[in-house]
Structures are given as C-alpha cells and as structure tokens.
C-alpha cells in the first residue's frame, strides 16, 4: 500500500475517499529500561533506549494503520502524520493517521 505525507500523488488520481484511518501503539520501556535511560540523562546525549522504542512504535503504528485502511477497501493513504503523547510517566503512545483513499492503477 502506498503511504504518503503529501495530499496528492504525482501521476495518480484519487478515485474515492474512504475516510480517516489510524493505527495506535502504546509502549513502555519497563523498570530496567527506564533506569538505564535515567542514568543517561545525567550525562546528556541521545537516549538510545527511547529512540529505538519510539522508532519501532512508529513502524508498528503505520502497519496497523495500513491494516485498517485495507479493511476499508483503500489502496493508499495520503496526508499521513504522527502524533505522540505520554501516558502516566512510563508509557508512550504513538498514533499514525491519515486519509484512506482509492487511487487509480498506474
């Protein structure tokens, strides 16, 4: 499935708008991961434990969004965006969202 952050796809025509679509993932590093990450904050720099967790969560959110768009009968997603928030102090929510559409075949 084609997923793009743009409104239009060059050379393709949107035939039908299916509607909004999203994928949600909530992750927690766990006590051990949080402890290691908190030690890294003392010295500064990138907290790789959280970077890799968020990167993986984004990939999974996109995968879930694609599954939902496919169930709606779409073959593309336009205007894809990410949103994220913290739930409590130990969990992160990542949402991938966009507009599910049917585009013409090349």
Report each predicted region and the residues it spans.
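N-terminal presequence-like segments and the immediate start of the first folded domain
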Residues: 1-33, 71-72, 92-106
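Gly/Ser/Thr-rich beta-alpha loop segments that engage phosphate groups in nucleotides
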Residues: 46-47, 86, 100
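Short, solvent-exposed loop/turn elements at beta->coil junctions and helix N-caps
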Residues: 6-9, 82-87
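Short, well-ordered alpha-helical segments
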Residues: 21, 26, 34-81
């Amino acid at each position: 499935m084609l997923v793009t952050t743009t409104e239009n796809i060059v050379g393709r025509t949107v035939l039908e708008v299916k509607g909004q679509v999203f994928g949600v993932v909530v992750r927690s590093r766990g006590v051990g991961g949080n402890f290691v990450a908190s030690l890294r904050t003392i010295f500064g720099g990138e907290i790789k434990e959280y970077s890799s967790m968020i990167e993986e969560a984004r990939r999974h959110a996109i995968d879930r969004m694609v599954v939902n768009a496919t169930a709606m009968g779409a073959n593309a997603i336009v205007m894809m965006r990410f949103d994220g928030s913290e739930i409590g102090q130990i969990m992160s929510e990542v949402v991938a969202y966009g507009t599910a559409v049917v585009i013409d075949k090349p």
